[in-house]
Amino acid sequence: AMAEGYENLIRKYQVEFYPDYVQIRRRVMDIKDKIEQKAAKKVPCHNDPLCENWVRGEGRIFLVDWEYAGMNDPMWDLSDLSIEAEYSRQLDDELLKAYLGRNVSEEEHFRFQANKIFVDFLWSLWGKARVPFGGTEMEQYAWMRYNRMKQNLSKI
């Protein structure tokens, strides 16, 4: 639903879509359909856990800026954290094992990788929708997200 909202804004502001967007979008939606057939339990998620939203204070760590919070696959937050903190494959595995409290199943690993794609797909659209207000910087941000999403798409 959020992707469609950003797509509508991109059209409204007459920002150019990515040249291969139609094909890439179809592949992303096919993966999304495959994931949704397994019906991962939705839980309350932050949906924007970039490093700047983690604040240390009073001997604890707080997660702030909950404007995008909602029900989602928990793998979204874990995938987003991995992307934003530039985790290696080893750190990804440690993160998942710590979160789950056990070894990761193939299905869970697939969901994690798929959510990395979904995260960058959505933020690449957000960036494009912000181009009229952020210019070249937003265009570069959008392309960085889109290209990384395509790299991850080629691995799945």
Tell where the protein language model's regions lie, with residue ranges.
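Start-of-helix signal in alpha-solenoid helical-repeat scaffolds, especially tetratricopeptide repeats
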Residues: 110, 114-118
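Active-site activation/catalytic loop segments of kinase-like enzymes and analogous catalytic loops
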Residues: 75-104, 117-135, 148
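An alpha-helical support segment within catalytic cores of ATP-dependent transferases
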Residues: 1-47, 57-58
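Pre-DFG segment of protein kinase catalytic domains
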Residues: 44, 62-65
